[in-house]
């Protein structure tokens, strides 16, 4: 199985597979303020602020998963210190959860609106197909500009940023430093599961 998510600069493939994806057409919702989502994990809590005006379909998709309870009990299954932490698709034991149809990649419009893959931002994980993101996401623990949109090609489409950590970055960094190992075909899996215990909308500030 191909790993969902970005690859570090030292592990980028020379060629990527191009495939058509079914697009999930999320209806943008008008927000008086940017929504905030609190994650409680077994290693501490953190909060994300989301930007529906800059990545509307991506935010609508993420909130639908969050509000349905989909992320509760999932794990951060791929952790690379000095790069990013990735979660939202597997339960303990690397049991993959069934997701809805993938969504359109908004990396280009998000970049034009000022959202970049930099320290503390959250973006959608995907396969080599640019339009394959569904539920998995990652949080950058350093500036990763090479993940930003460059051109409309499989190699250049980038990863859509849709929010940033506004509370608990110390928790995110602590997760990024957890020891990892290879579990079957999955690399960079925390040896001690990092469990997302709950995800909830919180009042915007």
List the model feature ranges, each with a label.
Residues 12, 24-205:
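Cyclophilin-like peptidyl-prolyl cis-trans isomerases
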Residues 3-19:
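Bacterial N-terminal signal peptides that target proteins for export
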